[in-house]
Amino acid sequence: MSPVGKRLPKEVITLIKTQKSSYKEIQDNVERLWKIRIPKSTISYYRRQRARTKAIDLEAVSREDWDWFQGLFSADGNKTLNRGNYGKHYIIRISLSMNDDPAIAKKCMRILRTIGPKPMIVPCGNCIQVRVSSKNLYFALKKQPSSDGVSPAYVAGAIDGDGTVDHHAIQFGQSRVPELFDGIALFFRRSSTPVSTWSTKNNYRRMYIPYQTLKKTLVLSFSLRAQRIRQSLGRERGDYSDGAGEI
């Protein structure tokens, strides 16, 4: 018998967690290899601590949807690693406005369900959180964009997360992830459509992105927030066309 209160050798714990056998077979193997007779309750305890890693399929969604989700996470998401009695929990959260962003939350939920994890929406005061637990997704998501540049869909996701409609433009502000702000500014410069940027007194940087710039760079095609400008222009003109083409 293993002495009461004494932790089992690491090799024994690894065998319990990895061997796909009956409790009786595990008991016999441990006794044969280490001369320790362990109770079934001990096997049950360590088996509950096995990593519950569920597969995700990033190929199940379009490249544009995945880029959009990454941009949204970079702007308005966070991830935490919680250690509980039964192992680690890899939590991803996207925080959105309860009044203004239900369509964004709906798109976010659709993408997550298609990839594989089971997300849920949690009310938090005036906000809603899209929350999901997934080890694979936890490591796939980064707050900083790729140094190789970002796509129109990625910029659209960031705008949907941290942008605001300002008449016929989007104002985007970002202070916590300077690489995101820099990456979006670089995207517009590379598209030959530079945007106005400035800093407030507390070094909070802001960016002003006109509607025509959003349209020219195709960001408009993917941003739910930017599409509100199109709808506003349509109401102002009485239609979604100005007679010379689509707004």
Language-model region placement:
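Internal intein/HINT superfamily modules and their associated LAGLIDADG
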Residues: M1-I247
